[in-house]
A protein has these predicted regions:
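Metal-dependent polysaccharide deacetylase catalytic core of the NodB/CE4 family, i.e.
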Residues: 78-159, 171-172, 176-183, 203-204, ...
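Generic structural signal for well-ordered alpha-helices
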Residues: 68-72, 95-99, 127-134, 163, ...
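The substrate-binding groove and active-site-proximal loops of carbohydrate-active enzymes
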Residues: 55-62, 86-87, 114-126, 150-154, ...
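Low-acidity, Ser/Thr- and Arg-rich intrinsically disordered low-complexity segments
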Residues: 2, 9-16
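C-terminal domain-boundary segment and adjacent tail
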Residues: 74-79, 230-311
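Active-site beta->alpha N-cap acidic-glycine motif
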Residues: 19-107
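Active-site-adjacent pocket scaffolds in enzyme catalytic domains
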Residues: 4, 19-29, 34, 143-144, ...
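Conserved, mostly hydrophobic/aromatic
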Residues: 45, 75, 111, 148, ...
Length: 311
């Protein structure tokens, strides 16, 4: 068990000046023996690209519905059920989309409400954001929402106090901490496997990081999203198999818009540079996911946790 002390913070919000001590305890994993349960989780962060990436005040459009349909087509073809982390504004605008996911046997969890990064919020703002996200997604899904993933993995070293707020709002699990340093997010030297975070007062959250392949001193993100679009497929598959060999589940994520190569051409105010970087790899993304999923055992996050003895 260790106590994590954060380095210098990136934000100047008043809330970030208060450090909440976290006890970090590795979760005990029981290697799966039930072949009917998946070993790895396929998760989807459901958001509308323009609103989530360029303008937080923009309306949610039906592009998100059409893009989710593309995801479902791939999952149906692979015979895989996924976990959909749905943004609150999406659930509020298209509640029937969320209820349809549940009806088809997929799992629904929360992905914030506004898509503003959590490190830009103070404690009161964060509590309102999380509470609204949880209630909105639960109302649309008709099921309890117990897991959370922060928009853009925006729980960083300087706002780890957000874990305390997650517990206060009623979340039991989190998949927000990217366990390596990247350009815009991540915490270096963070545990790669599932672990428990205990805050002052005894509240405990199960933290489930996305897939990072550790090769000696090198850490390679094979978790999905842009990494799935940029890295060679064989590297991704090798990394995921290495995680399996290390006896821990691989948590993979993506976004519905990554399955749509034509979407960026629909915006007149998106620069060529942004379109090129955001569109890279989208044309082959669905095929890539459809190739990787059948080669490994993927399913809903709740089933994966049950397989590893964590539920």
């Amino acid at each position: 068990m260790t106590i994590f002390a954060p380095p210098a913070r990136r934000t100047t919000t008043e809330a970030s000046k208060t450090f909440v001590p976290l006890k970090i305890e590795e979760a005990v994993l029981v290697p799966p023996i039930d072949p009917s349960l998946p070993r790895n989780a396929f998760t989807i962060d459901v958001e509308d690209w323009y609103q989530s990436s360029l303008d937080y005040d923009a309306p949610i459009t039906d592009r998100v519905v059409r893009n989710v349909d593309r995801v479902l087509a791939v999952l149906d073809e692979c015979g895989v059920k996924g976990s959909f982390f749905v943004q609150g504004r999406v659930a509020e605008t298209y509640p029937s989309l969320v209820s349809a996911l549940v009806a088809e046997g997929h799992e629904v969890q929360a992905h914030g409400y506004s898509h503003r990064p959590l490190y830009s919020m103070n404690r009161d703002e964060l509590r309102q954001e999380l509470d609204r996200a949880k209630k909105t997604v639960e109302d649309a899904a008709g099921t309890a929402v117990t897991a959370f993933r922060a928009q853009d993995f925006s729980i960083l070293a300087e706002n780890l106090w957000a874990i305390e707020t997650l517990a206060e709002v009623g979340f039991e699990m989190d998949s927000s901490i990217f366990p390596m340093r990247s350009r815009h997010y991540g915490i270096p030297n963070w545990p790669l496997g599932p672990h428990y975070l205990t805050v002052a007062g005894g509240a405990r959250i199960l933290e489930i990081p996305v897939a990072i392949w550790s090769v000696g001193r090198l850490k390679m993100p094979v978790a999905g999203g842009g990494y799935f679009r940029v890295l060679p497929r064989r590297v991704i598959e090798r990394g995921l198999r290495s995680i399996a060999d290390a006896n821990r589940p691989a948590i993979v994520y993506c976004h519905p818009y990554e399955f749509n190569a034509d979407e960026l051409g629909e915006y007149s105010d998106v620069s060529r540079r942004v379109a090129a970087t955001q569109g890279f790899g989208r044309a082959s993304f669905a095929k890539r996911v459809g190739t990787v999923l059948p080669k490994l055992s993927f399913g809903r996050l709740s089933d994966v946790l049950a397989a590893w003895g964590l539920r």
